[in-house]
Design a protein with these regions (language model features):
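Metal-dependent nuclease catalytic cores in nucleic-acid-processing enzymes
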Residues: 387-404
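Long lumenal/extracellular ectodomains of secretory and single-pass membrane proteins
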Residues: 1-383, 401-510
Length: 510
């Protein structure tokens, strides 16, 4: 990505902006699910009409390049959603170019990290085949699916298939039947027999066989998965969780009514799952004041290694904190009294999470709307627009050494956010600034006037933008020409349903 952008030439005088070529459009699609410069949070159905650049690149013989982009986005975690990657891979796997198809099928195990991804990929292929006379289960797909299963060891596969059983109308049994899989190892053979024939057949086949320690461990694990489905004994469920690492997806609904079962799950619960369930765990009295479980939760939340491993962003923590602080769920069905120790741990965790962020080493100018309307809630969130803007200012101030933070007042004025400030302190500084109109062209005009070098301009507003004499796209183009910097502009309308400022054909605007 860097190489291509560094080769790009600045637009000539009078041009509308940086051309949004097919590679850039493809990257937009892989990241956001749409090719243009407007990204909307609401999900929409993916189809050929939203992936025209992808189709053009395949037609031009650049299909293998597309597959490499898909792999890069998947492996580096650059996509906002996984579905566009899986859709694009499905399209590549069904095109007429043999090399592209081969590359796409070979990439399936790399892009489909968990069974859910594999099921979604298969469903996209089925959708793309609608109206076509030929079947989709040719030799190449059968091999790709077989390689997905055979590429794992027995224990890893057992964990995956018992946790993610089915999705998008597909199950593991379906895929094994249609792929004609030949197990590459004894472990895979055991798991596939378990899926297709059931535990009793596995038990019968191995009851008198001498097996390795690894196979013994696998058989014990599958036995535990089966046992937990049949038992009503709370102590046995807890033992199976602790002994074999069973997770919530392995348990029956009735098991999850038990406080003690939740306490057992809590010990090895990933931090991302914990953040989503704090309210429920408190409401069900699993987390009680000064209890040992509260201590476990607080220790996890303050653990920087766990935050980094779980790729937890400060926003994840803040949303969990604000949701937990309110004391009830979105629909009001679940109520709880927030635990003070957990609130303190969440607050500490919020600031620790900034340390896990990687700097981009770009030069940023962040411009913030400080009007009263920024107190509105962001669409689908518990956070206000001003809080989101403040956190993003903190992210930039703490991770990017070369950054400027400004606010829309009577003119662009400095917003004094420093790396050591807390969120309340940042919000106070924002509230102290006299309100001005939110003209999205002003950051570029200000930067050009003050000779401020910037690679990225980001504007945070709610829904209100004032159209001044110079459109933002023109101001950005003029800045690029005068400063000789291929700068980009991102305008984030946080309470808007239909917000379009970015030039539709400028790959440097979003």
């Amino acid at each position: 990505m860097e190489a291509e952008e560094s080769r790009a030439q600045p637009p000539g005088p009078g041009s509308a902006g940086w051309d949004l070529g097919d590679t850039a459009r493809l990257r937009h699609f892989l990241c956001f699910g749409c090719e243009g410069s407007a990204y909307r949070v609401k999900e929409h159905k993916l189809g050929f009409d939203s992936a025209e650049a992808l189709l053009r690149m395949i037609e031009e013989g650049r299909g293998c390049e597309v597959v490499e982009e898909i792999k890069a986005f998947s492996q580096e975690g650059r996509a906002a959603r996984q579905e566009p990657l899986l859709f694009a891979l499905a399209v590549c796997s069904q095109c007429s170019d043999a090399k592209t198809k081969q590359a796409a099928f070979k990439a399936v195990p790399e892009v489909c990290c968990i069974p859910t991804h594999l099921f979604t990929f298969i469903q996209f292929k089925k959708d793309l085949k609608e109206g076509m006379k030929c079947g989709m289960w040719g030799r190449a797909l059968r091999k790709a699916v077989a390689d997905w299963y055979n590429g794992k060891n027995g224990m890893t596969l057992a964990l995956a298939v018992t946790k993610y059983k089915q999705r998008s109308g597909w199950s593991h049994k379906d895929l094994l039947r249609l792929s004609h899989l030949k197990p590459a190892s004894e472990g895979i053979a055991i798991v596939t027999k378990y899926i297709t024939k059931g535990w009793k057949d596995v038990q019968e086949a191995y009851k008198e066989k001498a097996v390795s320690a690894e196979t013994e461990k696998l058989l014990k694990y599958l036995e535990a998965v089966e046992k937990v489905k049949c038992t009503k004994d709370e102590l046995e469920v807890i033992h199976l969780i602790e002994e074999y690492g069973l997770v919530r997806e392995h348990l029956l609904t009735n098991h999850l009514k038990s406080k003690e079962v939740w306490k057992a799950l809590l010990k090895e619960m990933p931090i991302s799952v914990l953040l989503r369930n704090l309210g429920k765990l408190t409401a069900n009295s699993v987390l009680e004041p000064r209890g040992s479980e509260v201590a476990i939760v607080c220790e996890k939340l303050r653990n920087e290694k766990l935050l980094k491993k779980g790729r937890i962003h400060p926003f994840h923590i803040l949303v969990a904190l604000e949701t937990y602080k309110v004391g009830h769920g979105n629909r009001g069905k679940l109520w709880w009294r927030p635990d003070e120790d957990i609130l303190e741990a969440l607050d500490a965790s919020f600031y620790k999470a900034f340390k896990t962020l990687e700097p981009t080493r770009k030069r940023f100018v962040v411009a913030v709307d400080v009007s009263a309307s920024m107190t509105q809630k962001v669409l689908g969130s518990v956070l206000s627009a001003s809080t989101v803007a403040a956190v993003m200012c903190m992210v930039v101030a703490r991770t990017e050494k070369d950054s400027q933070i400004v606010a829309f007042s009577h003119e662009m004025v400095p917003c004094p956010v420093t790396a050591d400030m807390t969120l309340p302190q940042v919000l106070v500084k924002m509230y102290e600034i006299p309100v001005g109109t939110t003209d999205c062209s002003l950051p570029m005009i200000w930067a050009q006037k003050t000779q401020t070098a910037a690679d990225v301009f980001i504007v945070f507003t709610d829904n209100e933008t004032f159209a001044g004499n110079t459109p933002p796209a023109v101001a950005l183009t003029e800045y690029r020409e005068k400063m000789g910097i291929p700068a980009k502009l991102v305008v984030c309308g946080m309470t808007s349903h239909n917000f379009t400022i970015a030039g539709p054909d400028d790959r440097g605007m979003l």
